[in-house]
Amino acid sequence: GYGSQRLASFYADYLAGAGPMAGGEPLKNAPAENCAHIAFYLRTGADDRGFYRNILTGYVKEEFERLQALHPGLYTHQIELIPGKGHSIDYRPTTPWLKQYTRNPYPKYVYWEDFEMDGLHRKGFYNLFVKERPNDDINARTRYEMSITDNHITLNVDNVVYETVQKDPRWGIEMKFRKNYTPAAKGKVIIYLCDELVDLKKEITVTVNGKQAFQGKVKPHLKT
């Protein structure tokens, strides 16, 4: 459960869906915002108290419900706390539910919280490629939020700092967080485009952090 929940957030752009079982990770380890375009199914026993799996699963459910309300049609999920069950649960419902969904390779809305996993950062996410991160600290996080409306692209890039608001008294596990955002002051991002995202025959405008960064026509090519 832990591994697939983390990978669902880290590699969401590769996936159609993910089905962690008997998991429940702190959301800092697997930001739910990254899962806008995947189907997410998490099942945990309501009595699975080890490392607060049941409580953390509840927090994950709350977050997915919040995101789905903000972005109707995105953040498809089913998150269950199974009454009377501990760490041993019925895994069989997960696969039939997931098989209903297909991957969206061309989303016009992208939310990516770039975070470190095992000493590595992703170099890109969907059609975004990072040439230069805004912060050289490997532990620093960055939020990239892109929206495409007709031929106008809006990209907001922010530094993300977590503030722990709940920690368990026994193990010191960070349970709940508040995120603070500040606009990034530097960095370089390539936005890859195709016919599925914009009309390449028409002029395109790009706005980054409230300022127009590009206006004009682009010529399709296969260079990287």
Segments predicted by a language model, with ranges:
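Alpha/beta-hydrolase-fold serine-hydrolase catalytic core, especially in secreted/extracellular enzymes
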Residues: 65-224
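Extended hydrophobic/Leu-rich segments
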Residues: 11, 45-48, 52, 177, ...
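The feature captures the conserved acid-bearing segment of alpha/beta-hydrolase catalytic domains
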Residues: 16-99
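Short, solvent-exposed turn/loop segments enriched in Gly/Ser/Thr/Pro and often Arg
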Residues: 1-2, 83
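Short loop/turn motifs at secondary-structure junctions
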Residues: 13-15, 36, 188, 197
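Short glycine-enriched nucleophile-adjacent loop
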Residues: 3-12, 18
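Short alpha-helical segments and helix-capping/turn motifs at coil-helix boundaries
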Residues: 2, 26, 188-190
